[in-house]
Amino acid sequence: METVYIAGGCLWGVQHFFDTVPGVQMTEAGRANGTTSSLDGPYDGYAECVKVVYDEKNTSISELMAHLFEIIDPYSLNKQGVDVGKKYRTGLYSTDPRHLEEARAFINGREDRDKIMLEVLPLTNYVRSAEEH
């Protein structure tokens, strides 16, 4: 099993979507790359995200990226739908450099690559979200 963290706006809708993607074994709502490990307090730079555990024999980072691009506006910076703010930015985060390389290759293989605002970065911090939002 492999784990990647995907940001696509409001985390609950993204989590619900990835729960239906073939090859995904488990999802969990959370926050990526904030500066604290607390859910309380002022905004600390995090992106709302979904921890996605998947079977690499049944799906890949490129396939997960293709699914993500079905539900986001990849050209939008810090905004998805009615949700506006830096925490709603789009991104893919991982502690595995291979995941980041594959995500970057997916973007670089697209004709619209220069317009894409989705960030691909190492995961530096993850905090699981509360059960209620």
Stretches with model-predicted labels:
Residues M1-H133:
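Flexible coil/turn and secondary-structure edge motifs
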